[in-house]
Curated annotation (Swiss-Prot):
Subunit description: Interacts with ZNF70; this interaction promote the transactivation of the HES1 gene. Interacts with NOTCH1.
Region (Disordered): 543-567, 600-645
Biased composition (Basic and acidic residues): 543-554, 600-610
Regions annotated as coiled coil: none
GO cellular component labels: cytoplasm; megasporocyte nucleus; nucleus
Family: Belongs to the krueppel C2H2-type zinc-finger protein family.
Name of the protein described by the UniProt record: Zinc finger protein 64
Subcellular location: Nucleus
Amino acid sequence: MNASSEGESFAGSVQIPGGTTVLVELTPDIHICGICKQQFNNLDAFVAHKQSGCQLTGTSAAAPSTVQFVSEETVPATQTQTTTRTITSETQTITVSAPEFVFEHGYQTYLPTESNENQTATVISLPAKSRTKKPTTPPAQKRLNCCYPGCQFKTAYGMKDMERHLKIHTGDKPHKCEVCGKCFSRKDKLKTHMRCHTGVKPYKCKTCDYAAADSSSLNKHLRIHSDERPFKCQICPYASRNSSQLTVHLRSHTASELDDDVPKANCLSTESTDTPKAPVITLPSEAREQMATLGERTFNCCYPGCHFKTVHGMKDLDRHLRIHTGDKPHKCEFCDKCFSRKDNLTMHMRCHTSVKPHKCHLCDYAAVDSSSLKKHLRIHSDERPYKCQLCPYASRNSSQLTVHLRSHTGDTPFQCWLCSAKFKISSDLKRHMIVHSGEKPFKCEFCDVRCTMKANLKSHIRIKHTFKCLHCAFQGRDRADLLEHSRLHQADHPEKCPECSYSCSSAAALRVHSRVHCKDRPFKCDFCSFDTKRPSSLAKHVDKVHRDEAKTENRAPLGKEGLREGSSQHVAKIVTQRAFRCETCGASFVRDDSLRCHKKQHSDQSENKNSDLVTFPPESGASGQLSTLVSVGQLEAPLEPSQDL
């Protein structure tokens, strides 16, 4: 047995007699020849032994105490032809017929045999007592190592798995998608990708309606319900649900924090505990140095005045730079609109497809994106989180608050480049630019009139197409014109004005209307020669022109002073002498039309209108008040004129 230093390692190709080249990459450990069972502590000596040509000699009967323990699971079941088992009190001998293996600590690398003849391998194990002291020692497994420098990939699933891994380095992608043309190095990746086109999501969550195309996405989703955060930072209490979030978080720590605070011991300890511990990522020394370098790397925008910073790599910075360069590589297939980011294009495509997946549970509103739905929900909750610090104003979104703050600062950032007009919001500027362009985009749906602004179109429709007579082709300018014209088609108005086409249902209303045609202007001003037909016009004149003079002479406001002849109060006093009382409830009125409106409330007495009116002759006393007992049906009540007229 040859012994040498244990600190060396080997990585390279080994030429075995017979023309077979085998890649070997092993860590320093005990190496056992699969033919003669000779042991080597040095890998170079073991390779030299294999190159010199191994023959089955007497060295195969080595001492049991120096032979590494190999369990029965070491030999694959498919390769075993005959197995004999002899159990003694000290040792256990297993004789198998199998290809040649190289056994090492926890690994086995398959080496092809030099001839087609089956070789008989005798494996001698340690005593049973010594094996019972280490029940946790895992059985040795057959593993293949990647030959590319720096790659630590190892597999125990044979050469096929190794070949799939090597496609990562070679870039070979033989599996192509028939729908989009995307290529994959593995067939199972293509199968998972095809679910994006077919929409098949076989992995469903038992807690909610979530469904995923692959099991890994479902496992990540389940951590949301369980609030499991297995990936923990060793520097601070931060914990995340997936490794990518932890990798981004580690960039926030500086190199000094990584060197001082990261513990040297491996977190995956072999000590047995009652409760299982959550896995913690422990970075190797090289990876920690790389992460420390990334932690100090902050990508800043190179444009003057821009303070954008990112720790998410160059891709995030490239997306930001498109704002300055104006590069919009993502173009819509239905319109000419372009976008700088692909996710913005995906959201824009919903405008053409009318897909609105985000629906309100309180009304029928549906939104294209979740942010629009959140803004809509604030209408139901009346939530106004954006508050002005200068006044009590509060808004539902930040854009409304930004526009409101311009009313305090007087800022008008949107200026017309053809004139000196300035505006607070961009929509006002767009409406203003239509004036310069002469464009009239708003067309009337009833005629050929076009307007530059929507407000002008609404005014046109209201004037020209709203106040239209239903019986003829008359078109009024406003509601008053239409009401005046509609009286021509009303045959149930017996009272008609002899001067115009006005008609009404009562004589009192006709008397009020007759003042329009009367040349007499009984209401005269005491301070000037102004006269009018209406008392309200006189009151407005005095209040507007002679307010100071009325205060100087200590005159009471019109309506509270003494009754003078010809005034509106005097006329009301005369009309009061013809009082109209309701027979049903006893209510009294000055005008008969007021009584008629009141009688409509008594639907059971509305048939006989003539019997509803009772006229009482006046009997004025010394004070000018009426105190005559009148009989209304079977009810006797004193009639007192109202003093509020």
